[in-house]
Amino acid sequence: MNFLGKRVLVVGAGLSGQAVCKFLQEKQSVVTLTDTRTREQIGQAIVQLSELGIELILGEYPSVDKGQYDMLVMSPGVPLTILPVVQAKKFDIPVLGELELAYRFAKAPIVAITGTNGKTTTTTLTGQLFRDAGFKTLVAGNIGLPMVSEIENYQVGDIVVAEVSSFQLETTEYFAPKVAVMLNLTPDHLDRHGSMEEYIKAKSCIFIHQKPSDYVVLNYDDLALRELAKSCPSQVIFFSRQHIIEKGSFIQNDKIMVSGKGGPEEVIDVNALRIPGPHNLENALAATAAAYTLGLSPRDIAGTLGRFTGVAHRLEFVANINGVEYVNDSKGTNPDAAIKALESYDAPIILIAGGKNKGISFNDFAKKIKEKVRVLITLGVHGYQIEEAAREQGFTNIYPVEDYAQAVQLARKQAKPGEIVLLSPACTSWDMFKSFEERGELFKKLVLEMQKNESF
């Protein structure tokens, strides 16, 4: 694909936008980068882009006139309702995202993974499965490394494993991974998409351009995904915790099994997995199905599954202090993710929750709180909504606090040996932090400082 001399407006100066600028600069495009933030707010990265000769329009987005640009490339965090996008579409100027751009230069087969929850764990595990099997493997996408940064370094015999979000998928045009994986669908990002129907429509972009020789891996236990299977143009592979599957992965007699290439084959005992919770069992099943579909053996898969211990900020063990286990699940940015975290433990839980809600009801979360939580500590701009929902369920052991230092100290005072202190906010971090990672790192820092003080 020839981008020589193409006039491209890159919208959003985050990691994705910066990577796109550098990529297009190498292709000798004429690149303009715009962001509503100022040069000072963006920081040093913008200086480097300026030195490359990239035109900067900062502080506000520009108007787009007919014939002014050949293409707009969007960063995933930027809504498609902004003026330059509306104008570009009016003038038939193509609008695409970094994921679509990377795909157009991809040679290696892509395993793309989406879903409301579990994406990062499944993406990391799937990448590790292929690495351990000897493949040169790129793990990229919504997981922190823009695909466009590395995509040209991977060839036909290699593997690309990409975590893809609804924000990325809604700006695709031809994107068609060799294997598309959809883990689950529950309400999320409704503040951006407007409705559950639009959210599902965006997620479905992961498979709508696939060919009959491609594969889509779907959660059979998710009724919405089972229904979506009817509209997939590719070969459907299922995974399930609750049903025996003819073509895919499933549980039988506490064993992960695979089928579809002859009779069922055993992979590993579920008790040998080192990632806790039924949702992580689903993640393991999804990764297994994707890897098996592309030729990995049950033996190869079992070796990696038995070693994999999870990823940061997803039910991440932090410390055991005086018999109390502290767990960081800062990636639990919606109620469904937090519910899955609560379901992962049998011990009584001291739960720290709250942050910025994404327009989602906390009713089901509150029911699970009443069932699993002994003490609820709330904070953040919408912590009060969780408190109100819990009180409506008859749960009253609630302590609102102002910050994370107070939350951790209060949790220490309330927790008894054998209990779990769990940070699973059910909200985004954007009211108090730049990211869920920053939130999780602060929680870990506070817990480890407390552990150090307890040891004296």
UniProtKB/Swiss-Prot annotation:
Disulfide bonds: none annotated. It catalyses: UDP-N-acetyl-alpha-D-muramoyl-L-alanine + D-glutamate + ATP = UDP-N-acetyl-alpha-D-muramoyl-L-alanyl-D-glutamate + ADP + phosphate + H(+). GO terms for molecular function: ATP binding; UDP-N-acetylmuramoylalanine-D-glutamate ligase activity. Keywords: ATP-binding, Cell cycle, Cell division, Cell shape, Cell wall biogenesis/degradation, Cytoplasm, Ligase, Nucleotide-binding, Peptidoglycan synthesis. It is found in: Cytoplasm. GO terms for biological process: cell division; cell wall organization; peptidoglycan biosynthetic process; regulation of cell shape. ATP binds at residues 115-121. Its EC number is 6.3.2.9. Pfam families: Mur_ligase_C, Mur_ligase_M, MurD-like_N. SUPFAM superfamilies: MurCD N-terminal domain, MurD-like peptide ligases, catalytic domain, MurD-like peptide ligases, peptide-binding domain. One of its GO terms (cellular component) is cytoplasm. It is an enzyme of class 6 (ligase). Pathway: Cell wall biogenesis; peptidoglycan biosynthesis. Belongs to the MurCDEF family. Cell wall formation. Catalyzes the addition of glutamate to the nucleotide precursor UDP-N-acetylmuramoyl-L-alanine (UMA). PANTHER family: UDP-N-ACETYLMURAMOYLALANINE--D-GLUTAMATE LIGASE. This is UDP-N-acetylmuramoylalanine--D-glutamate ligase. It comes from Desulforamulus reducens (strain ATCC BAA-1160 / DSM 100696 / MI-1). The gene is murD.
